[in-house]
């Protein structure tokens, strides 16, 4: 287990970490100064309170540790740090890893097989990631392994099970389920027509509601323009849940850049 050397130190030492450089990635470029400062504070707390376990001789420098913490905290920027209390450890492999998976088919038969995984979110357990795919999570590609696994934890908060419906007001549940299932059907239909490789949204989202929520959370933060175009009503529901509007933030950033 790797214990960060600053875990027991105070915020003054947190300030010595390369936060400004860590924030300088495309995914975070549209944050306001106030949001960047708040995210930095959340990420510093994350590094102090979570145990990051580097496996198979993986090593991360201070900059990449900071960037990883920023990714973990982006989804809870306006929800609050306590939304990350569903886990205490993050296990990180250098590359995608092999697991012994067990699943039950529609006939009740249990199957066991070895599978390659990019990440996992264990119910009432750690988050497991791999550094190779984390490195593809800093841009605006629509892919973000960290946000995907954090979304599973947020989904399971309250009920204890990830089912595609995160903790929202009861009056919102019916509409949420309707719009999420409609998106799953559209994503699956597109994949059937053009093929998985050519689909605009990862077809994995069509596999079940929990994966749809996690995959669309990736697009919500890293490709909001695609999400809002394809599923405008569902996008607004995500805005209300996460208490953020990445598309609007991106528009404001583009306007500011154009003026400058």
Curated annotation (Swiss-Prot):
UniProt entry tagged with the keyword Zinc-finger: no
Cofactor note: Binds 1 zinc ion per subunit.
Compartments in which it is found: Cytoplasm
Record-linked InterPro entries: MetalloPept_cat_dom_sf, MtfA_enterob, MtfA_fam, MtfA_N
Gene Ontology process terms (BP): proteolysis
Primary location recorded for the protein, binned into one broad class: cytoplasm
Residue numbers binding Zn(2+): 111, 148, 152, 211
Cofactor(s) the protein needs: Zn(2+)
Keywords: Aminopeptidase, Cytoplasm, Hydrolase, Metal-binding, Metalloprotease, Protease, Zinc
Database matches in SUPFAM superfamilies: Metalloproteases ('zincins'), catalytic domain
A GO cellular component entry from the record: cytosol
EC number: 3.4.11.-
GO MF annotations, alphabetized: aminopeptidase activity; metal ion binding; metallopeptidase activity
Domain of life: Bacteria
Subunit: Interacts with Mlc.
Function: Involved in the modulation of the activity of the glucose-phosphotransferase system (glucose-PTS). Interacts with the transcriptional repressor Mlc, preventing its interaction with DNA and leading to the modulation of expression of genes regulated by Mlc, including ptsG, which encodes the PTS system glucose-specific EIICB component.
Family statement: Belongs to the MtfA family.
This protein's name: Mlc titration factor A
